[in-house]
Every structure is written in C-alpha cells, then in structure tokens.
Amino acid sequence: VSSGGPITQDNTGVEYYATLFAVDESPIQEGLIWVGSDDGLIHLTKDGGNTWENVTPKKMPEWMMINSIDASSFDTGTAYIAGTRYKLGDFTPYLYMTEDYGKNWKLITSGIESEHFTRVVRSDKVNKNILYAGTETGMYISFDKGNSWNKFQKNLPIVPITDLTIKDNSLIVATQGRSIWILDDLTVLHQLSQSTDEAKLYKPKDSYRMRGG
C-alpha cells in the first residue's frame, strides 16, 4: 500500500512509516547510536552515522512501533527497547534487551500483565541490574535486568506512562494527562535486592542542615 504498511484508525499521519521514533546515543562510547522506527526496524551505527547496520530482533513481530531505546551506561553493547502494536489490536508488552550490539535479543517481559503494553524502558544509572518500565496502565520495576518485573505504582495514578528519565538520582515520570511525577532520591532502591528474609538497614544519601539568619 502507498502508506508503506498497515492502515490504522490513527489520524496523526504517522502511518506513512519509515519514520524514526526513538534515538539514543551511548553515554560511554561516542558515535555509537541506536535508532528505532515506527515500522519495527532497529539500526545501529558505531561511527557516528557514517554506516548503519540493521539489528532488528529476528523474532520480533512485524510493524512494531519502537517507542523508546535506552543505551546502557555500563556496557557499550547493551541496549533496551520498548515497542507497541496496540494500533494493530495487539496489547502485548514488548521489551527487548541485547548485550552484544544487537546480534542477539532477549524478550524481557516476565511479570508484566499481558495487556499492559509498554511505552518506555529506562536503565538505572547507578545499579546496572535495575530497570524501569512505563506501560499503558502504570509503572514496573526490575531488579535483575528484566528477567522479572514487579509493579511499582505507589501513589501514581493509573495512567499511561509516556516517558521516563533519571536526573540527579531522581526518577522523573511523564504521564498522559496526569502531569509529571518525581520519585526523589533513588539511593534506597540501589540497595534493595530481589528479596530479603531478614532485617536490613539502608544508608540514605548525605543531608545537610542549614542555619538561617
């Protein structure tokens, strides 16, 4: 078809496809850039865009919209992607991880409910095992690089999470229609393990008392 792919009921004009929807450069290797498109393709360049390689997961369903890409702050070959197919009637969550520059990908959605389709995934900047995922119906967290996920809703409203970012060790959450939320200071999360059977003391970040006058 002239649109380049399936026609949906979306009226934003994005179904002409071949449009880059997500871009992220490695924070630890200059010129290593990941891009994802609205027709389900992922490409990687290691030389600042001079040459590109198609590294799309072989088993990923076609016509996936790549909503977000997150390049690891620890390993140059590691990246995470979140994709959606809800416009095609598929509400399945799709999160993938690679640790070898896209040669092999692993689906990492265990623990996320079957119709909570995923809009964004971000990796922690301090603890390489912690991941955050935003779905159509709220937040999830993983303490084992995506092998398992737990709901992380707290006092967030049940609302689509459209983007996540970490700034000054705080998690900033963008929602669709319910403002921006901030989880201040991730220090305690960095000290959590997957599970614990005994009491544990957590070290908070340093605080300062200031005198006025």
Regions found by a protein language model. Give the residues of each.
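Beta-propeller blade termini and top-face loops
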Residues: V1-R211
